[in-house]
Amino acid sequence: MASAMASSALREATCTMTRLAADVAASVSSIFSCKDSAGPRPVVPATKTTSTPLDVMFFTWFAKSSGSSLPPLKVVMTGATISIDSTRGALKKLARKGIKGWLNQYMATIKEIEPIVLYEQETDARWASYSILVRVVTSDGRVSYGEAVPTLRILPVVSAVRQTARAFLGRDPHEISAAFYEWYRQDFFLSRSFESATALSAIDMALWDLKARELGAPLYELLGGKLRDRVKVYANGWYGGCRDPQCFAEKAKEVVARGYDALKFDPFGPSFNSITSEELRRAEEAVAAVRDAVGDDVDILIEHHGRFNANAAVEIAKRFEPYRPYFMEEPLHHEDIEGYRKYRSLTSARIAMGERLISAKEALQYLVEGLVDVIQPDACNIGGVTGSMKVAALAEAFSVEVSYHNAYGPVQFALEVQLSAVTPTLYRLESFYDYWPQWKRDLIGDPFRLSQSSVEVPRGPGIGVAVNERVLEKYRAEPSEIPVGEEPVWVVRGTWR
């Protein structure tokens, strides 16, 4: 009985696809202004779909009836190369949009790339008051977003996005790698530009999101499939206003009570380049107070912001050894290679760094020399999804953990959750999420909920969240520079004493 039903369904499917093939052939001929006197070729049973140049189009159709799986069919026709991954869904889509409209989606180009500055004054960090989203619009009206770095560079970054966009406008949005190398040839080859790199990164993010949404799949599926359903995170941004050990300890307890089992903080106040005995004593007291407050089962991570010379960094590492920090982040500026070599030879501390790197080739030097234990690529700097995956692959080859730097905004956060889901050597993802102003969370619908120091990986298409256009328009602002004050823009507000 089941066999008869299957055969009947197969005959019906063959007839349906033959008629569909004729319609598509006519549409393709009109779009490409080409004709084929032979007409559509016959339906041929096949076990898989292959891809060829524009003179051949394949449709793969899996017919299902009464729970029976039928052999896939392949319809070979003149025209362009297109794949349909489901039967009824694809047919319904074709019926709704029309053959020509559906095909136009696959021939769309990048029509517009727009940097959008968002702002609302925030109490705990001046850079957290800003976001720079980059909106990519295709010629058929699809929209996606990436995110760029705002710190101290609002106007230069906005200008760089507009300049970098020239390498992408009019191109096929699917050709992400080709667009990257065109950008490299046009805009980057003769200079090392942070602004250009963050502009590229934001556009790359948006194009990957766009491609995944087009396929109806979460981004992690395009990157090989997820390795974990939940991503472990650590808290940052929680210690605003802390200048004494008691404040750090009390707020650290609140972080753990919220559900985190790892947290990062900068205990160094206004120390810069060198550190006095008194400054080191106060920093040590803060670290000791946090360790005592959270116990031995919580990872504490020490943020240096890359601001010490090698001698000071080594002295700090030795003083902090009794408190067992999981890693020491950016004890020196990333350009101080000799300083990192000295630090490695004189301390046993795990080194975390990488947020300032803008290419996989830069990351490679630290990996080859064994100067990093936890590498921290930032998707907003390193080249978006494309650059992040290159660094993650290198990290796996060198048995180095990955912890994506993740400070700027909700689009970056959602995208790096997807990246973290597929990264083999993941340590944790950085999270300011619970300590951002509410508007940043509302920008993507505030979907992430902490449980056991982790967040669930969204299963929706693309990066798994959608930008709320109403919230975006509410906080849209004219590009302007972040004012420079006594307290540097990169610190958590109120900690520079």
From Swiss-Prot:
InterPro entries (alphabetical): DgoD-like, Enolase-like_C_sf, Enolase-like_N, Enolase_C-like, Gluconate_dehydratase, Mandel_Rmase/mucon_lact_enz_CS, Mandelate_racemase_C, Mandelate_racemase_N_dom
Pathway where this protein functions: Carbohydrate acid metabolism; D-gluconate degradation
SUPFAM superfamilies, alphabetized: Enolase C-terminal domain-like, Enolase N-terminal domain-like
UniProt keyword Lyase present: yes
Listed EC numbers: 4.2.1.39
Keywords noted in UniProt: Carbohydrate metabolism, Lyase, Magnesium, Metal-binding
Listed GO MF terms: gluconate dehydratase activity; metal ion binding
One Pfam family here: MR_MLE_C
Catalytic activity: D-gluconate = 2-dehydro-3-deoxy-D-gluconate + H2O
GO biological process, any: amino acid catabolic process
Cofactor, how bound (note): Binds 1 Mg(2+) ion per subunit.
Residues holding Mg(2+): E303, E329, E355
Coiled-coil annotated spans: none
Positions marked as site (Increases basicity of active site His): D378
EC class: lyase
Active-site residues annotated for this sequence: H305 (proton donor), H405 (proton acceptor)
Function, as annotated: Involved in the degradation of glucose via the Entner-Doudoroff pathway. Catalyzes the dehydration of gluconate to produce 2-keto-3-deoxygluconate (KDG). It is not able to use D-galactonate as substrate.
Name recorded for this polypeptide: D-gluconate dehydratase
